[in-house]
């Protein structure tokens, strides 16, 4: 797993690409592109399997966790997908999901988020979960 600290402009670039309706290839390309860009900029990449504790820690530090999930459970689509986690408690996780009609503060269970993160390997052949943590500017 990669945990990546990136700048806000990198997140905007992801959002702009995904907002244009590009799909699976963009999600896969963007993750590779960001990792390469991060390495070149000297950002710290932590090779570990991110979990809900990493997401909770980021939220506690007022940081923005972006998580790549697989869309099968949430949207019945066979594609990787980026979401932003906005809140978490003992039972639920709140996400901003640009693919969802509601968009903001979509509530999912903790177990469903873990499953969607794990489904990346099962359905998309992405070897590891991907979590990007951005600092608020």
Predicted regions and their residues:
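Short alpha-helical "patches" and their helix-cap loops
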Residues: 7-10, 83-88
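Noncatalytic regulatory segments and standalone regulatory/sensor domains
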Residues: 27, 59-60, 70, 76-79, ...
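A structural signal for short, well-ordered beta-strand segments and their strand-loop junctions
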Residues: 5, 66-68, 95
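Internal catalytic-core helix/loop-beta-alpha segment
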Residues: 27-73
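Structural motif
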Residues: 64, 82-83
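Cysteine-nucleophile protease catalytic domains, especially the papain-like/related folds used
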Residues: 1-46, 126, 132-136
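Short, catalytically relevant binding-site loops at active-site mouths
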Residues: 2, 73-74
């Amino acid at each position: 797993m990669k945990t990546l600290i990136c700048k806000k402009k990198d997140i905007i670039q992801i959002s702009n690409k995904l907002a244009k309706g590009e799909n699976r290839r963009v999600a896969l390309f963007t993750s590779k592109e960001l990792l390469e860009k991060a390495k070149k900029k000297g950002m710290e990449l932590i090779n570990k399997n991110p979990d809900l504790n990493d997401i909770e820690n980021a939220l506690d530090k007022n940081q923005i966790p972006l998580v790549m999930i697989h869309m099968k459970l949430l949207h019945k689509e066979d594609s990787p997908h980026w979401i932003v986690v906005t809140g978490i408690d003992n039972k639920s996780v709140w996400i901003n999901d640009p693919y969802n009609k509601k968009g903001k503060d979509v509530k999912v269970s903790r177990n469903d988020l873990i499953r969607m993160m794990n489904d990346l390997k099962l359905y998309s052949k992405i070897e590891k979960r991907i979590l990007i943590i951005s600092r608020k500017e």
